[in-house]
């Protein structure tokens, strides 16, 4: 495995601030964890402290491109565990758990919303917007400091489009759909290919390589049937006729 480094990763993505942050003890853990993660080339997504089965501190992290492999989680755990032991932000015994954001991940940064335009999201506002706090819909884009969604739960006489101020968002999470699963699998395969190239297990991309052209659909007639292929115009008969025409002869046909 090749761990990302601060020099190799995109600096702007690594240092991009989170819009959704934790309160209380989780905030103290985040203050310790985030510099460690950034130094390794990872981004902090979320800290969650659970009292189930004792105390579990979940640190959700990712690479700047949004991926996170098992090897990445293991590397973060080895680096972060001793730092947390020294800083001691929690006053009781706990179990440290490092995880990826998952497919139906939380959206905590502006770039998270940008990457998932076209996908379904559930948003809970910390500050009510249009007299409501909960919204659900398709992310259609960004407008300044707001995220644009098309709601799927509105009445017929209501405008489904709404722009939510990102600074007022308390929680945002993707909704698991077939399209989201397919997109996640595509990104995972791309990350795996990139890792193999980094390890020398796969050939690098050729500089002139181009994506395969998509097959064009056959033209359709009005009745829905495929159009017939036009007759060839460069047969031996056509060539002989052209020669006779050039010589001024009359084509018997």
Swiss-Prot record:
Q: Does the keyword Methyltransferase apply?
A: no
Domain of life of the native organism:
Bacteria
Here the segments flagged for biased composition (Basic and acidic residues) are 186-199, 240-253
Q: What Pfam families does this protein's entry cite?
A: DUF150_C, RimP_N
Spell out the residue ranges making up region: Disordered.
186-253
Report the function annotation for this chain.
Required for maturation of 30S ribosomal subunits.
Please state what the protein is called: Ribosome maturation factor RimP
Which organism is this entry from?
Bradyrhizobium sp. (strain BTAi1 / ATCC BAA-1182)
Quote the gene name from the UniProt entry.
Answer: rimP
